[in-house]
Regions:
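Non-transmembrane, aqueous-exposed alpha-helical and coiled segments at domain scale
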Residues: 2-47, 51-189
Length: 189
């Protein structure tokens, strides 16, 4: 039996905005392309918002890293990720695309949080490095993450109704992220 058997009933799935968007990395001369659907299949249904955050951060960072890489290619196994965001959806997306988790190049560092941005935005920071290039993706303050979502995720002893509502909030956040270009979700530093 799955340890997740007690999760709430999931809301009806809605179409994913821009399902044709892809992330491209390279491994030993072979081009690898991933869609959001690929990332969700790897992660499972639990945290579509976290998957969308990582997908957008990668979509923002990879072109910048490619511009500073030899041949314009980013080798997936050369990417290091540092973030204060510990969510499993983001972690699994970075693992699928970069293999950074199993190869110890994925680091969750709470001290990277931008606490001056407030509780809602503080942890949405992703630093990606390859070679001498580093890109830091910082979530735009544009209503992408609802305060209600942060408050409800942090609430202990959620009721069944609150858990069901949290599932809806996750899908709404996923859609707010994916209906925008990654540059409209994350700024780069």
């Amino acid at each position: 039996m799955s340890k997740h058997a007690a999760t709430p009933e999931r809301p009806e799935q809605t179409p994913v905005p821009h399902p044709d968007r892809t992330l491209t990395v390279w491994e030993d001369g072979v081009e690898l392309t991933f869609t959001f659907a690929d990332c969700m299949k790897y992660h499972g249904p639990g945290f579509p918002g976290g998957v969308a955050h990582a997908f957008a951060a990668l979509g923002r960072a990879l072109p910048v890293l490619a511009a500073s890489s030899a041949g314009g290619r980013v080798e997936r196994r050369d990417i290091t990720v540092r973030t204060p965001f510990g969510g499993p959806g983001a972690r699994d997306t970075f693992e699928l695309v970069t293999r950074a988790v199993t190869e110890n190049r994925y680091n969750v560092l709470p001290e990277l949080a931008r606490t001056e941005r407030g509780n809602t935005l503080a942890r949405y920071v992703f630093e990606l490095s390859t070679g001498d290039a580093t890109v830091t993706c910082v979530l735009r303050n544009d209503g992408i993450v609802a305060d209600e979502f942060i408050e409800l995720t942090g609430k202990p002893d959620k009721t069944a109704a609150e858990l069901a509502h949290l599932e809806v909030l996750k899908l709404q956040m996923r859609d707010r992220i994916l209906e925008r270009d990654p540059a409209a979700v994350y700024d780069v530093e």
